[in-house]
Amino acid sequence: MRVSDLFIYPLKSARGIALPAADIDAYGLPGDRRAMITDAQGHFITQRELPDLARIEVRPEATAFRLLMQGKTDISVTPPQPENRMDVTVWKSAVSAAVADPESNRQLSEWLGREVRLVFFDGQARRTANAEWAGEATPVTFTDGYQILVTTTGSLKALNADLAAHGEGSVGMERFRPNIVIDTDEAWPEDRWAAIEIAGIRFDLVKPCSRCIMTTQDQLTGSREGPNPMPAMGRIRMSADRRVPGPLFGWNATPRGNGKVTIGDTVNIIEERPEGWALKRRAAA
């Protein structure tokens, strides 16, 4: 097995960036979900609420980054001042975040048709993952919960096979917004992986990822009119464990070391979860 793709998402819920290689540190992939859009009160906003976020492209620059959206004037975001801060929430986590300059926030609010703030996870920000799954003091940025999302090509192929068998269109891996994609022949092997090793770095697969309405959205347009993977996940990937309810695709992973991962790197299984993950069994139609 080998690494087939690597992605970061500099702005939470905006378009991803494909990478040929990526450094790995305690937070995951540097630059991943270090910026986020919130409402005026600091509550995080994603494609679940605002599908148009899928239309925002992020181009990293020497100082900060540029935001682009078709039909809109580019926004050049300057580095935030550490003293300009606000308290924001990501799910149940409270974070002190640096706030973008007023002009960037004004332009972004015009783009999205509502008052928003662009905030940054800077050197003063602190947040940790759920200790029940990831262990104590595991740092995270503005991700939904963990540092890295791992998916496999074999699992996507199996999901698309189920969609095709029911006369439904196929979807791409971008619907699931992974960080590390592993090329596999087998479907769902990740359910049995407790830990893998890539380029000398251990990754603990700590929790399966339950999926939401974002998987139904085209990741270029934000449209929900195209192929929808949710019915297939409902048929073949419904969790039977009440701790993680809903349809599953991919696993949240926590790195246990630093290093660099490159496309083509070999993936070794170093610890298995023989029981896999319990799924609901649906009666044949």
Predicted regions and their residues:
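Metal-cofactor-dependent catalytic cores
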Residues: 1-285
